[in-house]
C-alpha cells in the first residue's frame, strides 16, 4: 500500500500552471520520481477544472 502522499493546492489555474512550468519542479521531479514504486497523479483532470473548482 501507499505509505506517503504529496498534495498541493493552488489559488488559481494560473498558479498551478506556474508551478508545473517551474524549472525547480522539473529538477526535483527528475531526481525524485524515479525513486517511487507507485505513483498517482491527477494533473490532467486538475488542469481542466474551472478556478472555482480548484479552490475547494
UniProtKB/Swiss-Prot annotation:
InterPro entries reported in the protein's UniProt record: Dabb, Dimeric_a/b-barrel
Pfam families, alphabetically? Dabb (PF07876)
Task: Specify the protein name.
Answer: Stable protein 1
Coiled coil start-end: none
The superkingdom of the source organism is: Eukaryota
Report domain Stress-response A/B barrel positions.
1-44
